[in-house]
């Protein structure tokens, strides 16, 4: 008899606990995870570091330390890892908005783009229509016309691909530098490995 009651009570208890966890966002546990932030990025070259003449350079900018604003308030790892499945982390955008993203090379790219000047105007972005939706469609857009938060969305696996379709006409070996400017004055800088155009 006791074993039968136990078999009923344990699954019922687990079920009720899951209901509480799934609905936890509505009761304020997740109310402070509206925003996200990061302070470090890397440049990931998607094709090899040697670019053939018929190919475009393709790369990603990836956040290395994305943080959501309320994680410090939750002391229990079990609760934190469980409600993370349901809470919509960072849905309201960056806590400290971005004001500018600049991509440059350490070498002369062509006559219009000498070393350490912006290459933004020759970069095309393959981006989701809505980076916050998993089933969103991709499209191509000029770098300078894309909102900053779409370039670095709250989930880094949704980050777009960046294309430099033009070939350099000056130096053949380049290191890209990405500078990300925040509204609080912080600047995040990342540099790629050497890239060589054949």
Locations of the language-model features?
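Bacterial Sec-dependent N-terminal signal peptides
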Residues: 1-35
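Non-catalytic macromolecular-recognition regions in eukaryotic signaling proteins
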Residues: 25-198
